[in-house]
Amino acid sequence: MLVKHLSEPWFSLIYCGKKTIEVRLDKGHFHDLKPQDTIEFFNDELGFNMRRKFCIKVISIEQFDTFELLLEKHISNALPTVKSIEFGCQILQQYYSKENELHKYKKLAINIERVSAVTNEPRTSATSC
C-alpha cells in the first residue's frame, strides 16, 4: 500500500467527497499505480503530535500531456475550490517546482474513492486501512 502526505485543503476535500480526482506526475510510485490499488493519505498539519489518515481506492487513471488538458476535463473534481484553469495550473505547479519535471512526465488524473474513515493517531503509529 502506498502511503502519502496530503496537505490541506486537499485532505479534507477528498475526505468529504468533494475532490474525487487526485493529480500527480507519472513518476515514482505513481507510475506503477493501477485500478484497485489502495493509498493511505495522512496529514499532520494540525499539530498536537497527531496524524490524521484515511484510505482511498484507485478507480481509474487517465494520462494527460499538460495540467491544462487535465483541468479542462476534471477541474471541478480535481480542484473543487478553483474556478479557472489558469489558477489551477498555478496551484499544481507549486507542488512540482522543477521546470524539467513538468515537461518530462505525463500528468495523471487518478479517480479515487474513499474507503475508510479518518482516524487520529499519534504520529509514530503504523499505517493500516
Question: What spans do the regions from the language model cover?
Answer:
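Short, charged/polar surface micro-motifs in flexible loops or helix N-caps
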Residues: 30, 46-48, 63-67
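Short beta-strand-centered aromatic/proline hotspots
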Residues: 49-63
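Compositionally biased, charged N-terminal/linker segments
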Residues: 1-35
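Contiguous surface segments at macromolecular interaction interfaces
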Residues: 69-129
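Short coil-to-beta transition motif at edge beta-strands of beta-rich domains
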Residues: 31-45
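Residues that flank catalytic or metal-binding motifs in active/ligand-binding sites
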Residues: 35, 54, 108
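Short histidine
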Residues: 3, 38, 49
